[in-house]
Amino acid sequence: GYAGITHEMSEFYEPVPPVVTPGTDSKGGGFTAPSDAIVLFDGKDLSAWESVKGGAAEWDVHDGVFTVNKKKGDIQTKQKFNDFQMHIEWQVPTNITGESQSRGNSGIFLQGMYEVQVLDCYNNPTYVNGQTGSIYKQSIPLANAMRKPGEWNVYDIIYTAPTFKEDGSYRTHPTVTVIQNGVVLQNHTT
């Protein structure tokens, strides 16, 4: 060892992390969530969601997926979250039209304050702080990992909520990590 330091001095036995049974991926014959996950969409209904204007979420549910219904407005989870890890699979339609921000523009809002951009950026240039995987108009993504229209994209988002002092100023800033299709787009971004 180093000058009186033993290996026991650097070994910790508490707190013991909880055991979480990993889920299976969809390529393995059907996706299952990890044992500690809160499932927000079961492939059948939007019972965990609501309209941001109040009332039921009225997007279209079919064939195990849900689809944006522009006429019905935005939706949000009924349950409120602070720190979380989110896994979401999404795609833009094969027949998508438009250019730049008019091509499948959507987003995942974190506590209603920060938006992880969802947009078709496959061969579709736009301003870089508004492309897929950006923290909209705040942080440029490290890469463009967008798949072709009609192919599934995967976001894994890890978010740590801000904390505040009594005067309303930040005690700790929020952080977000965004991984799209296995590629890091945001790495502990504040």
List each language-model region with its residue ranges.
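Carbohydrate-interacting regions of secretory-pathway proteins
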Residues: 1-190
